[in-house]
């Protein structure tokens, strides 16, 4: 990926890393535009990424975008609830916190989640 293709801190990212960075913005755009090229382009432009480079990060289209969004939520959850913290908790509390985190992460994007489930069904 060329340095001129992506703005700011995103210039040095691999395509896999770029996927994770773009995923929340794509989910936000998917509320209005669905999980497709329009949402991808809107997210890329909002983050200062060349839409052509962004498209390279999602060769599988909507499914890749949805998988990246889920992976980003998983990564955020792992950072917020590290194993060292979870290991000290009773199993019920671990489950409660993990499920709670996932529900809170999806709440602002209920429509994106509905659209994602329709694609994955």
Regions found by a protein language model. Give the residues of each.
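Residue-level detector of well-ordered alpha-helical segments, enriched
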Residues: 22, 39, 65, 69, ...
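Short, amphipathic alpha-helix enriched in basic
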Residues: 6-42, 46-51, 60-67
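Hydrophobic alpha-helical connector segments
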Residues: 16, 80-119
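N-terminal mitochondrial targeting presequence
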Residues: 1-3
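Short, basic, alpha-helical segments at the C-terminal edge of helix-turn-helix-like DNA-binding modules
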Residues: 70-76
């Amino acid at each position: 990926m060329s340095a001129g293709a992506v703005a700011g801190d995103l210039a040095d990212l691999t395509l896999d890393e770029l996927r994770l960075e773009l995923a929340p913005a794509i989910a936000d755009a998917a509320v209005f535009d669905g999980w497709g090229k329009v949402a991808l382009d809107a997210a890329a432009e909002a983050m200062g990424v060349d839409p052509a480079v962004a498209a390279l990060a999602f060769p599988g289209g909507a499914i890749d975008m949805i998988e990246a969004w889920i992976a980003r939520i998983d990564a955020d959850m792992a950072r917020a609830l590290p194993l060292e913290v979870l290991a000290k908790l009773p199993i019920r509390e671990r489950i409660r916190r993990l499920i709670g985190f996932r529900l809170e992460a999806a709440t602002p994007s209920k429509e994106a989640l509905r659209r994602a489930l329709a694609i994955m069904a």
